[in-house]
């Protein structure tokens, strides 16, 4: 079946001649960096045209926020499958993994996941490259005498390699044994150092691990040290429940207030803010309303955005983001009229959205697209999504959703745009067919379900 990629509304397209599946190399790379499914469609039509870009994608993580959306390894793997000489791409990925050095990026996870896809297809060179890197990092951990006075990148790399390599119970037990031996032999190791691996794979192979722990002291040590960390975290959580406001400060306190605080508690923090005159301490008091909406007239907070104290300025802008009040909208519009077109000001407009602001909000988003300011565009998307949350009394700026789908650099946030487009019956067959190849697994599943 021939599939034409979904085309965004013409007024939001940078290239007015864009024709769906047929893209220039520049259009292709920009769409690929966002993880849009049209790139898979385009590669299948004209693989040689995009070969160098797909090869580039093999060598590095290019997800905007891999911690939230995952890497783009499946997405890259699917594009590579359009080429008959897969070994060329596997060798390039293996070479990048060999050259990789711990740096705190998500490159290692992208490279190792991509190689594992090919290893599962029977390419031994891909599996060998993974095993060699795992052995290299593990050997380095055993050679280390102390924990570094920085983020322990090597530990994170080892855990990520373990997650990728543990594809069945046998490989899981081998890696759990290696991690347990590290716990036994190295004093610098701390309980819960492999919490991600334990929670992800340990639950999957729990019974197998418990049985093996009775016979293998390394696996037993791994199980004990990870379980001890879970117990400690649960105890800490219970302590925080007893007197939450005594144990929480800043943004954490504000989140608790937004969901659980009674009116009397909120008023106490309002009073604490009002009575404070010293700018630095006033900023600290106002952090209680970073997430919890300020319940009274916000004019004092608006005035604090003009403070000479930068900390108080920033805290005031953050507090205004949660307030739906005519004076806040008027403040935002006045700022725009005076040339203040910042992401912080856009957030106030999004929270206080009314249909009359449709044109100016589109204009502000278009400015970010033209400047390729994707961080600000990403932030604007999150501000807009607040209007769609359950229980929100904000009118839905649904006309902005196609723009967010098209240009949001984060596939996790793009998923939100699609969810809200679905609620407003804005999804088309063309769009869903493109989503079948999206970099985001949840988007692909949603599209497949709706196209049945």
Give residue ranges: language-model regions.
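Structural detector for internal amphipathic alpha-helices that build alpha-solenoid repeat scaffolds
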Residues: 37-48, 67-85, 107-125, 143-170, ...
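Terminal, non-catalytic domain-edge segments
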Residues: 22-27, 430, 449-452
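Post-signal peptide N-terminal segment of secreted/secretory-pathway proteins
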Residues: 80, 94-105
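Charged, amphipathic alpha-helical stretches
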Residues: 6, 18-90
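Acidic, Ala/Val/Gly-enriched low-complexity intrinsically disordered segments
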Residues: 4-5, 10
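Amphipathic alpha-helical scaffolding segments comprising HEAT/armadillo-like alpha-solenoid repeats
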Residues: 24-25, 50-61, 87-99, 124-143, ...
